[in-house]
Amino acid sequence: AVKCIGWQETCNGKLPCCDGCVMCECNIMGQNCRCNHPKATSECES
């Protein structure tokens, strides 16, 4: 799983995206995070 550094965007206002997702995308500075593939038990949505 990819881990972001710095600030992480929340998913649905709940958990940090990269903490609850199998994969995420970051910008070049690692200051933004977006779910690509949520875990089955995660409340993140891609």
Curated annotation (Swiss-Prot):
<keyword id="KW-1015">Disulfide bond</keyword>
<feature type="disulfide bond">
    <location>
        <begin position="17"/>
        <end position="35"/>
    </location>
</feature>
<dbReference type="GO" id="GO:0090729">
    <property type="term" value="F:toxin activity"/>
</dbReference>
<feature type="disulfide bond">
    <location>
        <begin position="21"/>
        <end position="44"/>
    </location>
</feature>
<keyword id="KW-0964">Secreted</keyword>
<dbReference type="GO" id="GO:0008200">
    <property type="term" value="F:ion channel inhibitor activity"/>
</dbReference>
<dbReference type="InterPro" id="IPR036836">
    <property type="entry name" value="Agouti_dom_sf"/>
</dbReference>
<dbReference type="GO" id="GO:0005576">
    <property type="term" value="C:extracellular region"/>
</dbReference>
<dbReference type="InterPro" id="IPR004169">
    <property type="entry name" value="Spidertoxin"/>
</dbReference>
<comment type="function">
    <text>Potent toxin that may paralyze and/or kill insect pests such as H.virescens (lepidoptera), S.exigua (beet armyworm) and M.sexta (tobacco hornworm).</text>
</comment>
<dbReference type="GO" id="GO:0005102">
    <property type="term" value="F:signaling receptor binding"/>
</dbReference>
<feature type="disulfide bond">
    <location>
        <begin position="26"/>
        <end position="33"/>
    </location>
</feature>
<keyword id="KW-0960">Knottin</keyword>
<feature type="disulfide bond">
    <location>
        <begin position="11"/>
        <end position="24"/>
    </location>
</feature>
<protein>
    <recommendedName>
        <fullName>U1-plectoxin-Pt1f</fullName>
    </recommendedName>
</protein>
<feature type="disulfide bond">
    <location>
        <begin position="4"/>
        <end position="18"/>
    </location>
</feature>
<keyword id="KW-0800">Toxin</keyword>
<comment type="similarity">
    <text>Belongs to the neurotoxin 02 (plectoxin) family. 02 (plectoxin) subfamily.</text>
</comment>
<dbReference type="Pfam" id="PF02819">
    <property type="entry name" value="Toxin_9"/>
</dbReference>
<keyword id="KW-0528">Neurotoxin</keyword>
